[in-house]
Amino acid sequence: SRLEIGRDKFVDACWDWTHEYGGIIVEQIKRMGCSVDFDNERFTMDEDYAQAVRKVFCDWYHDGLIYRGKRIVNWCPNCTTAISDDEAEYKDEKGHLWHLRYPLTEPVNGQDYIVVATTRPETMLGDTGVAVSPKDPEKAAFVGKTVKLPIVDREIPIFEDWHVDANFGSGFVKVTPAHDPNDYAMGQAHDLPQINIFDEHAVVVEGYGEFTGMNRDECREAVIKWFEEHDLLDHVEELDHSVMHCYRCDSALEPWLSEQWFVAVDKLKGPALDAVNSGKVTFHPARWTQTYTTWMENLKDWCISRQLWWGHRIPVFYCEDCGWEDALTEDTDVCPKCGGHHVHQDENVLDTWFSSQ
């Protein structure tokens, strides 16, 4: 495996493969009848091209258009890397909707517990809230109350949020900000703690007793068994739903809170929208204008870092002595701030689509 041979030898092996098979791929393209200038080939890892990619990254970094932050990403626990929304493949699967009882800290209208509905009971270990729809008058009396989260004995609040569909499940939605994009948004809006219960392999981290060390499938079975044994499993429904899978290895993806590099799309899309809204750019047929506008308005910041070894390595350097950080067009092993020699480059590589822009 790549981990056994190390980064340098793995990259060397990738170059060997490129030199051996790159010409074959070009010949295949020719036989397909592609009419291109084959005397003007460009490989994305060519030195001059790599320098251009590096300069763009550094320019955007210094202009505040690229930043590092901790956010929810699509994570493959098998490939151990983030992947983009466009690289995720959706598959319809037969699953279940588990209805779990969460005890109230104080009775409400004679009720001692609420029932939350979830397709992912294993993530309840990281719940930090329960949400209801503002359009659901039957739940109004519960807003502002708290429940005692089973297993971990964590007291969490009940609140209203527009992300909740009052007609889905029980109307009570468990909120796990570190393991669901909608929950992350609700957590940001309501200032909820973010608790990551999985490591990069989707294995339960330390601090969860008998569940620690279980993979996500084992954890699901164990959590359901625990709820059954404690008479807190209300009922189970069959449910057809769509699950994201990795396009490389077909593993189910994990929405995972991790530190990554992002392009600040919100800062870039304004001029593109203004050009259309002002009439400077027009679409034919005109009906595509609304499609474009809706797409642009809903774009999220783009995760451009990948935890892989083959690709354009992110040109950000760090000093372990003084904390200096900067994006550089040339490598360095000396800190320009303190003169220290404990300088290392970011381990991540760029999403291939960044270098193809």
Q: Across the structure, where does each feature detected by a protein language model lie?
A:
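Residue patterns forming the tRNA-binding/recognition surfaces of aminoacyl-tRNA synthetases
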Residues: 1-113, 168, 172-320, 356
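Short functional micro-motifs and their immediate structural scaffolds
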Residues: 84, 254, 327, 341-344
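Short, mixed charged/polar active-site loops
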Residues: 109-114, 153-155, 325
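Acidic, glycine-rich two-metal-ion catalytic cores of nucleic acid-processing enzymes
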Residues: 117-121, 333
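Catalytic alpha/beta core of large soluble enzyme barrels
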Residues: 121-201, 228
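Active-site-adjacent "gating/activation" loops or surface patches in catalytic cores
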Residues: 154-159, 348-357
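Cys/His-rich Zn2+-binding cysteine-cluster or related metal-binding knuckle/ribbon modules and their
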Residues: 314-332
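Cysteine-rich micro-motifs
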Residues: 332-338
